[in-house]
Amino acid sequence: MRQFEFEAKASNSINRFYFGFGNESFWS
């Protein structure tokens, strides 16, 4: 359960990085 929680948080951070920072780079 702990491992799954860690992976979910890591995945969410990566998604935020790509969709947040990435979109700002492409669309600004």
Swiss-Prot record:
GO cellular component labels: host cell cytoplasm; host cytoskeleton
Residue spans crossing the bilayer: none
Keywords, alphabetical: Host cytoplasm, Host cytoskeleton
Subcellular location: Host cytoplasm; Host cytoplasm, Host cytoskeleton
Comment field (misc): Product of an upstream open reading frame of the genome polyprotein gene. The initiator methionine is coded by an unusual start codon CTG.
Protein function: Plays a role in the reorganization of host microtubules and intermediate filaments to form a cytoskeletal cage that surrounds the viral factories, protecting the site of viral replication. May play a role in viral infection of human cortical neurons.
Name of this chain's protein: uORF1 protein
